Design a protein with these regions (language model features):
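Phosphate-proximal small/polar/acidic motifs at interfaces that engage nucleotide phosphates
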Residues: 168-169
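Charge-rich, well-structured scaffold segments of protease-associated domains
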Residues: 1-109, 125, 136, 142-143, ...
C-alpha cells in the first residue's frame, strides 16, 4: 500500500467504488457468499471471520485519515518481506533499501498475540430467491507450518479435491445429487479449516 495513495482523494473515492462493486458481485454469487457465511459461522466474532472486502457500509464511510491511520498502525518493517530475484548488485540493493526505507519507523508496532479459536458448533443461513441451495460445512483444520499439512493435502485430494475424489464420484457421478461438490483446506497463521461445499436442488 503506497503512502502517496492517501494524498490523492480522487483515487481513494474511485477505488471505493471499485470495492463496492466487488462486494455487490460477491452478494450476487451464491458460491462466494456461502463461503463467507461459513467463515462467520466457524470463527464467530474474530478478525479471520470477517469478509476480506468488508461491508458496503464500512467502505462507504472510510476516509483518507482512516486509511492513513491503518497504514501507520499495521505496516511495519517487522511484518514486511522484501523479495529480490535476478541479476543484481547486493551492495547497491542495500544502499537503495537504506535510501528508500531507512526512515520506515517501527515505533508503534504491536504484534498480534491472541490466537484464533473456532466458535461453538452452529449453523448460519441466508435466504435468497435463487434456484439452487448452496451448502458449506467446516471442520477444524491445520494452521500454516503444521507438520501434518502434507497428510491433510493428500487426504483432501482423495476425499473431495478433484473430479476423481470420493465426494465427487459418490455425490455427483453415482447419486446425481449435486453438480458441484468439492472440499478444500484453508490454513492461516494460527488456525485452519477443512471445508466441504455443494450446490444442489432444494428438493
Amino acid at each position: 500500500m503506497n503512502k502517496e495513495f492517501f494524498e490523492a482523494l480522487a483515487l481513494l473515492e474511485k477505488e471505493k467504488g471499485v470495492v463496492l462493486e466487488e462486494i455487490s458481485m460477491c452478494e450476487d454469487t451464491p458460491e462466494d457468499l456461502t463461503h463467507e457465511l461459513l467463515m462467520l459461522a466457524h470463527y464467530g466474532d474474530q478478525p479471520v471471520a470477517r469478509p476480506i472486502l468488508g461491508s458496503a457500509e464500512q467502505i462507504s464511510a472510510y476516509t483518507r485519515d482512516d486509511l492513513a491511520a491503518y497504514w501507520g498502525a499495521k505496516y511495519h518493517p517487522q511484518n514486511a518481506v522484501l523479495s529480490i530475484a535476478g541479476n543484481y548488485d547486493w551492495a547497491r540493493v542495500q544502499q537503495m533499501i537504506g535510501e528508500k526505507l531507512g526512515a520506515w519507523s517501527a515505533e508503534n508496532y504491536r504484534p498480534r498475540s491472541d490466537a484464533t479459536q473456532p466458535a461453538a458448533p452452529g449453523c448460519l443461513a441466508k435466504d435468497k430467491e435463487i434456484e439452487q441451495m448452496h451448502i458449506c460445512l467446516g471442520f477444524p483444520g491445520l494452521k500454516i507450518g503444521d507438520a501434518q499439512n502434507y497428510e491433510l493435502s493428500l487426504f483432501n485430494s482423495v476425499f473431495g479435491g478433484a473430479m476423481s475424489s470420493r465426494l465427487f464420484q459418490k455425490i455427483r457421478e453415482e447419486s446425481g445429487m449435486a453438480y458441484t461438490v468439492y472440499s478444500y483446506p484453508n490454513a492461516y497463521t494460527d488456525c485452519g479449516m477443512l471445508s466441504v461445499y455443494a450446490a444442489t436442488n432444494p428438493d
